[in-house]
From Swiss-Prot:
One of its GO terms (molecular function) is phosphoribosylanthranilate isomerase activity. The keyword rRNA processing does not apply. Its EC number is 4.1.1.48. CDD domains: IGPS. This is Indole-3-glycerol phosphate synthase. InterPro entries: Aldolase_TIM, Indole-3-glycerol_P_synth, Indole-3-glycerol_P_synth_dom, Indole-3-GlycerolPSynthase_CS, RibuloseP-bd_barrel.
Length: 261
């Protein structure tokens, strides 16, 4: 299963990074960290004036689709997203997604929206990295972690001032996310084990969530009508990457899917 492969490789890479730059050193660098986490909850919670919130993804490739965007310039992409997106998601996984954590720092210098570090996070070291490089929130995948691990990592992120998007794909994941104390819960239409899609998943899982949670729909989203219908059942925000990455005019694509124009 691809998720298991990615997690295994992530742990191997992490071992090398810890040897090269120990966690203690990373922690010390926080004393000089110029980045203060921004208001993620405010950015993502839907309102009457803005019922559809967009997390626009900066993504070069994926294991399911291969290379998505050849002319990949993270700063330029972020600047095109800036006007209509409410937050950015930046892939930092290097092998399958061709990501780089340096992209977070680059984008933060030139754009003002909160930034999600989207990676396969399994260790506190990666959360410290996210903060040092300028992220405002991180992704934790419920299926990749035990209940105890999820709760521990989520609480550590909150302790550092970072928010957490906990990604789910079934009722068991949702229970884990709620028990761990997640404020933001993502529902990924794509199964990370076999890449199959279930576009009806939000309708099944949203009713299981307590009031007050920020709900994010992920994967397979490419038109305004989808977002409008999902917003009616309680989805606050929509994480969209591949659709935008395949556009020549990214800015117009974000406006169209958000406003239906």
């Amino acid at each position: 299963m691809i998720l298991d492969e990615i997690i295994k490789k992530t742990k191997e890479d992490l071992k090398k990074r810890k040897a090269d730059y120990p966690q203690e050193w990373l922690g010390r660098s926080l004393a000089y960290n110029p980045y203060v986490p921004r208001d993620v909850l405010g950015a993502l919670r839907a309102s009457k004036s803005e019922p559809i919130k967009i997390i626009a993804e900066i993504k070069k490739a994926s294991p399911s689709k291969g290379m998505i965007r050849e002319d990949f310039e993270p700063i330029k992409i972020a600047q095109e997203y800036e006007q209509y997106a409410n937050a950015f998601s930046i892939l930092t996984e290097p092998h399958w997604f061709k990501g780089n954590i340096e992209y977070i720092t680059q984008v933060r210098r030139y754009a003002s929206r909160p930034i999600l570090r989207k990676d396969f996070i399994v260790d506190k070291y990666q959360i410290l990295e996210a903060l040092v490089y300028g992220a405002d929130f991180i992704l934790l995948i419920a299926k990749a972690l035990t209940q105890g691990e999820l709760k521990e990592l989520l609480e550590y992120a909150h302790h550092l001032g970072l928010e957490v998007l906990v990604e789910t794909h079934d009722a068991s994941d949702v229970k884990k996310a709620v028990f761990a104390g997640a404020n933001i819960i993502g529902i990924n239409h794509r199964n990370l084990d076999d890449f199959t899609m279930d576009m009806g998943l939000c309708e099944k899982l949203v009713p299981l969530l307590p009031n007050g949670k920020i709900i994010v729909a992920e994967s397979g989203l490419y038109e305004y009508e989808q977002l409008r219908e999902l917003s009616k059942i309680g989805v606050d925000a929509f994480l969209i990457g591949e659709h935008f990455m395949r556009q020549d005019d990214i800015k117009s694509a974000v406006k169209k899917i958000k406003e239906g124009e």
